[in-house]
Structure formats: C-alpha cells, structure tokens
Amino acid sequence: METIRLNKAEFNNVLQMASQMAGVSKTLPILDNVHLRIKDGTLQITSSDSEVTITKGYQLLYNTSEDCDIIFNPKSLCALLPIIADDEIDVENNGSDILVKYTNGDMSLPTFDVDDFPILDLDAQNAKSVTIEDCAGFAETIKDASSFIANDYIRPIMTAIVVHIAESGIEIYASDANILYFSKFSDKGNQDEKFILLPAKAIKPIYSLLKYSSDKSFTLLYNDTHAKFVCDGGSVTTRIMEGKYPNVKSVIPQTSKTDIVFDKKTVQDAIKRVSLSTNESKLGVFSINFDEAEISAGDADFRKVSKEVVEANIQTGQSLRIGFNLQKLSRAISVIEGPKITMCANDKDTATLWHNSDDNHTLVLVMPMRIE
C-alpha cells in the first residue's frame, strides 16, 4: 500500500472524537477498536458499542489513489499523537498491521478483520427528519439536561433525556424526580410528533459532534428505534430507549402566588458558603421578606449554624419561608443563563419554578424540602 500523509492535528482531532465509544462494550472485544476508512479522498473513523455509534471524517489534504478499510485499537495512538511535535505523520497499511511514522520513530499496531466490526446505522430513506438550527446551543442544552437524569435501575426510563418533536417546536427535558429541567429549544419542529428518548451514554458523543461543528445547523433523522444526528462530516447514531416517559408538563405550575428575583451569582455564592453548615440532608431555609432573603442552614449534632442575607426583589406576592436541598438547588441554578434569576412559588410545600428573569424558555422545577 502507498504511504498516506496526514495532517497530525486534524487526524488527532477526528480520532479522539470518533473513538469515544471504543471499549465501552464489555461483550464484544472487536468493539475495543475503531474502523478507519479512506475512500474517494475522504478519511472516516467510526467507533461503536453496538447501541451508540459515532462517525467523524474529513477531506484529505493529499490525494491518494488507494482506498483503505482497517480495524485497529486506537488507545495507544490517541496517547501518542498529542505528544509528538510533527505537523504531519505517515500511515502505511501492511495487511496485518498499520505503521504510523513520525520524525523520530514509528508505532506499529495490529489490524483486524473489517467484516467482524458491526456498524449501527439508520436507513435514511425510511426515516423522518428535521433540520435544527444552532448546533452549539443544542449541545449545551442536552448537556445541561443530562445533569438531572435519574440514576434509577427500577425505572430505567428516567435515565433518558427526552427530545420532543412536535409541529409547535422542539422541547428537551429530563428529571430525577426532585428536579425537572425543561427547555423550549425551538419554535420550529415537525408535524409528525415524536418523543425521542436518548440514553445517557449517547449524550457525550452527541455533544462532541455538535458543540465543535463548523456547521450552524444539523439534521436529526429518526424512526421508531433509532435517532441519527448528522453534521460537519460526522454523525452519531443511537438506539432510542423504549417506553413512555411521564408527562412532565403536567407538573409544571402554570401560575404562582409569589415571584422573587435574585442576582444569580450572589445567591449562588451565598448557597455555597451556607452549605458548609448543613447536615446530611443538605437542608437550607430561604426566609424571604420585603427586599431581602435570609439563607440559613445548621447541623444540630455538630452545633454548626450559618446564615447569609442577600437582596431579593419580590415582584408579586408576599413573604415566604421555604426549604431546599441546597446542593440540588445550586445545581439547578447553575444551568440557568443570565445575571438575574426568578423563583416562582405558591407555598412552602409545592414545587418552585426557576428561570432567567428575562427569558422563560428554560425552566428548572425544584421540589422543596419540608421544614418545621
């Protein structure tokens, strides 16, 4: 085989991204490897665990007259490429191994039978599709949602992130039963309604593909069993989780008696400091009155008590005393963008809704804790 010259940085970026699913499967040893294909001047690398497959490719700078199909374990090469100084490397396929050459040395890696490598894909001709604007925004939204999936083996459906496609738009949500993350991501959807339940392990590959894409939009293909995200010379195909996700929209309060505006950073910092005195329950109490809120916590066993006062602007309603798990509340607030956040509440025993004070497209519902 002829020697193929590759730009090291470009090849390394593609290899690192595309090899994410290699070694995830514990049942098929062949899936410890990646599939590298060169065809018609395009290099493409694929890894899979049989349920999630990521593929990334790019157009080669140097023309090659020879196509290539090889399977190899990427672990050593992923470690080598970032620590060699060369701008370019040479790759030779010798049949039973590949030889990667750089200025001061080389690395030989065994190759395996291409036919043994299973590829998970989706038949585009029999799939529905929707074009979604803002690759990076979608990536950040599913990353935020992934912070609130449940770790629940009894109800595995709650470990999913839901992408709800409807004619009215696209919604993304997830819940661990204590916190609900809900984003009205787009007003443009598809007339064929679909609830796509993404498994947690698909989120990182999808995020990597979309976040660093040079494309502004991506295509989402889907059928009853699979979803495929396509952009910028790459794709992630994942099995869709089976089952029916709870109707989370039914628990989102439509009205509130008390709306309170906080400075996000101020309240985050106060929660962080007060949390140092909580007991195992992580209970903290917000006592809101007029134009301020006292955040307090204590641990009677160790005689620790902390409290801080922060500015609070009551937009509607009146004073309120309500308890939260401060650790979970801090996590909920962290995914809300903007300098000001609003808490919408009805009483100390029902769910509160938190959102950007200037935008309610992203809502985080937080359940309170009982206080005496």
Segment roles from a protein language model:
Residues 1-372:
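Structural preference for solvent-exposed beta-strand-turn elements
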